[in-house]
């Protein structure tokens, strides 16, 4: 199965969610990586939303840098976003932005650490997504 590529800040919320999925995954480095992450196969991006509800800063800078690499951007096939409902209309805004800019489907959104139901839905959805692609 193709991997999830994900970003998680030092809070580790997204990382903990990805671990629960028990799916192949590659983490975008937080900072200070000597080499840029370069993927070699199609992937689904899992991203947290930041910015406190503002479109400015909603997508983490590390994710922007990763997607600014034309090769990495060419392999994205879908996006999943985490967010905080306290952001109101901007809940999971990073997913909307990436889906629109990269022209890929917005597959799922969940709040903060996600629930057991979110984990099951994402695991099932990702598996079915890749089955349809092959």
Swiss-Prot record:
Pfam families attached to this UniProt entry: Flavodoxin_NdrI (PF07972)
An example Gene Ontology biological process: protein modification process
One MF annotation (Gene Ontology) recorded for this entry: FMN binding
Job description of the protein: Probably involved in ribonucleotide reductase function.
PANTHER family (alphabetical): PROTEIN NRDI
Entry's family note: Belongs to the NrdI family.
HAMAP family: NrdI
Name listed for the protein in its UniProt record: Protein NrdI
